[in-house]
């Protein structure tokens, strides 16, 4: 088993004081959340999986295995936990220790979600390669099936009766008995995720709606916004959904009747989790915020996890703020997802110290200059640096790219 930059730490530099309820420690957008009675398991764009003591708001363990974004997390019956990533891998971690007991690499694309069966025997994963993976926890045996006609699986969840729900970009919701499809329901728009609300499946859509599904079709619908919804969580009593604009709505699980709306101020909210009394929101600012489920009131301070390291009031500094979440301008990386940009110009790609670059970047022959940095943001990382773990972000306007390059020339010296 080849472990990629596995790190572990106990209550180290990302430990929060006991009086602070928010969880600070990720250096990139928080894209995965799972909760147990006293723990939180998070994953983020910074490739880290963090296990938290929920009561003390303290990091218990920090792990790095995945190449790229950690897309899903789940707790397991034996006290261990699971993580899945953009790299197509599913890792099973023991309750104690810092190395995974099993790593499955059955998917050829990012994994959209994980779901534990009600009997605790099976972990299901759905991937953008259109396949479902069923992992038997006791034996480690894996079964993979083609599920959505080669289209992306965008969410999975188990109903209390043991049937698996999967949704995909082929605009279908499928109910599975084991690995056998038993019901297929057409969807009106592209689904972005699913969570189980009692005996129903709460599905979020790119058209800004949440729809509640039973075995015979739609039970309830709530149109929340004109923007795509990015995250969903549910319990037998409540459904929470979040948009790419950062709004969060809480609804009744029975009929999606509105309860309250939150504005975390975190940029896009990429992940949600519900307990009996709390809502947790994972934001684009790397912060996990906590809210009272009954009132919608914040439980923590809400201070931004990442601030601009340098601001001279220029347009370039304004454009830089989108980069500051994942990169620092100081000699160290500031516990962020990407390498420091200190001393950027004149540096060969993938040579900043103390950063675990992907193999694809280490093979490239690029030197960072004003011209190459501008081209990176003109065409995007997927085109300019294929194999990069960097999100495919672009700066479309030439004047904004020029302003960013001028700012970096000043700020990275």
Residue positions per predicted region:
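Electrostatic cytochrome c docking/interface patches
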Residues: 295-319
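Hydrophobic beta-strand positions that form the internal "hydrophobic ladder"
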Residues: 40, 81-82, 123, 164-165, ...
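The canonical Cys-X-X-Cys-His
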Residues: 316, 320-329, 404
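Gly/Gly-Pro-rich "capping" loops immediately C-terminal to redox-active cysteine motifs
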Residues: 331-369, 392
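C-terminal capping alpha-helices of c-type cytochrome domains
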Residues: 369-413
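WD40/WD-repeat beta-propeller blade N-cap
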Residues: 23-30, 64-70, 104-111, 146-153, ...
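Short coil/turn segments within WD40 beta-propeller repeats
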Residues: 28-31, 46-50, 68, 87-91, ...
């Amino acid at each position: 088993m080849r472990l990629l930059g596995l790190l572990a730490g106990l209550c180290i530099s990302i430990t929060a004081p006991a009086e602070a309820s928010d969880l600070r420690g990720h250096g990139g957008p928080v894209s995965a959340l799972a909760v147990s009675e006293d723990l939180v398991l998070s994953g983020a764009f910074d490739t880290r999986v963090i296990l938290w003591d929920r009561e003390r708001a303290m990091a218990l363990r920090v792990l790095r295995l995945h190449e790229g974004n950690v897309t899903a997390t789940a707790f397991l019956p034996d006290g261990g936990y699971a993580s899945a990533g953009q790299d197509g891998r599913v890792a099973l971690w023991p309750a104690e220790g810092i190395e995974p007991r099993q790593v499955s690499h059955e998917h050829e694309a990012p994994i959209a979600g994980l779901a534990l069966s009600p009997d605790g025997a099976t972990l299901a994963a759905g991937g953008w390669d259109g396949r479902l993976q069923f992992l038997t926890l006791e034996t480690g045996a894996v079964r993979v099936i083609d599920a959505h006609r080669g289209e992306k699986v965008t969410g999975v969840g188990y109903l209390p009766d043991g049937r698996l729900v999967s949704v995909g970009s082929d605009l279908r919701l499928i109910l599975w008995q084991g690995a056998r499809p038993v019901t297929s329901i057409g969807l009106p728009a592209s689904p972005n995720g699913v969570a189980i609300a009692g005996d129903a499946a709460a599905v979020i859509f790119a058209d800004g709606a949440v729809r509640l599904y039973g075995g015979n079709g739609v039970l309830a619908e709530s149109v929340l916004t004109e923007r795509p919804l990015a995250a969903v969580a549910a319990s037998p009593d409540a459904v929470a959904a979040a948009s790419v604009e950062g709004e969060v709505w809480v609804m009744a699980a029975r009929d999606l009747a509105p309860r309250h709306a939150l504005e975390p101020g975190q940029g896009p909210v990429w992940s949600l989790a519900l307990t009996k009394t709390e809502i947790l929101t994972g934001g684009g600012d790397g912060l996990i915020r906590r809210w009272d489920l009954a009132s919608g009131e914040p439980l923590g301070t809400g201070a931004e996890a990442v601030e601009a390291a340098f601001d001279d009031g220029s347009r370039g500094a304004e454009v830089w703020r989108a980069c500051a979440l994942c990169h620092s301008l100081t000699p160290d990386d500031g516990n962020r997802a990407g390498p420091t940009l200190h001393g950027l110009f004149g540096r060969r790609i993938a040579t900043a110290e103390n950063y675990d670059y992907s193999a694809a970047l280490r093979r490239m022959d690029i030197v960072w200059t004003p011209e190459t940095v501008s081209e990176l943001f003109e065409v995007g990382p997927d085109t300019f640096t294929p194999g990069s773990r960097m999100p495919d972000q672009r700066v479309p306007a030439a004047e904004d790219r020029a302003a960013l390059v001028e700012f970096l020339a000043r700020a990275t010296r």
